[in-house]
Amino acid sequence: MAQVDLLNVKGEKVGTLEISDFVFNIDPNYDVMWRYVDMQLSNRRAGTASTKTRGEVSGGGRKPWPQKHTGRARHGSIRSPIWRHGGVVHGPKPRDWSKKLNKKMKKLALRSALSVKYRENKLLVLDDLKLERPKTKSLKEILQNLQLSDKKTLIVLPWKEEGYMNVKLSGRNLPDVKVIIADNPNNSKNGEKAVRIDGLNVFDMLKYDYLVLTRDMVSKIEEVLGNEAGKALTA
């Protein structure tokens, strides 16, 4: 199995953590990663852009001047696309831009992105990362200890509780830092708890240079992505 150094918030090595090769050390599939990012960005589009054609703009029923004997170019409507305030040719109309990707491809894309970070030595795992209260200075000091103060950093934390939420609030004023909180366990249809990693996504992992996880988050990721069947996954 692959191994990573386990660090504390002071940047000190406190141990070694074995991580799944199936999740963190596969040959990245860049095609599937692109498909995932394309799906993400497409699903963000509102699809509300709308223009009017020459048949929808107001006016234009009367011919502006006679066809002949004026010395001017012939025109049939003031709402022609070549006129100012005329209709728009082939303009956008409201549409649904959303795309879908099957669960296996989503998982493969996430494993590929995680493997890219691991192989580039840009994956850091902490024993834990909590703050007693939201304070940007405290998080900034932790990033300095990890030698990430001037790096674009994505921090992914396992669930919503006060200590983790304080980290998320502390990161709002740091322009190169994004903190993602994975959702709480949700009830599945059969009544069992489903572990979810909804916040983890390929786009953010590729956008930010370094990925910071906690030990609990690694376990959660391996539980969801460590096998091809069963676990809940949304994006």
From Swiss-Prot:
Task: Enumerate the UniProt keywords alphabetically.
Answer: Ribonucleoprotein, Ribosomal protein, RNA-binding, rRNA-binding
One GO BP: translation
Q: What InterPro entries is this protein classified in?
A: Ribosomal_uL4 (IPR002136), Ribosomal_uL4-like (IPR013005), Ribosomal_uL4_dom_sf (IPR023574)
- CC annotations in GO: ribonucleoprotein complex; ribosome
Residue ranges of coiled coil = none
Pfam families from the UniProt entry:
Ribosomal_L4 (PF00573)
Q: Where is the composition biased (Basic residues)?
A: 65-75
Superkingdom classification of source: Bacteria
Q: What else is known?
A: A protein containing 11 mutations, chosen as amino acids which probably interact with nucleic acids (K140A, E141Q, Q144K, Q147A, S149E, K151delta, K152delta, I155M, P158G, W159E and K160L), gained the ability to regulate the E.coli S10 operon, suggesting it is now able to mediate contacts of L4 with the S10 mRNA leader in E.coli. This mutant protein did not associate any better with E.coli ribosomes however, indicating a separation of residues interacting with rRNA and mRNA.
- Give the function comment from the record: One of the primary rRNA binding proteins, this protein initially binds near the 5'-end of the 23S rRNA. It is important during the early stages of 50S assembly. It makes multiple contacts with different domains of the 23S rRNA in the assembled 50S subunit and ribosome. This protein only weakly controls expression of the E.coli S10 operon. It is incorporated into E.coli ribosomes, however it is not as firmly associated as the endogenous protein.
Q: Which NCBIfam families match?
A: rplD_bact
- Name of protein: Large ribosomal subunit protein uL4
Taxonomic lineage per UniProt?
A: Bacteria, Thermotogati, Thermotogota, Thermotogae, Thermotogales
- UniProt gene name: rplD
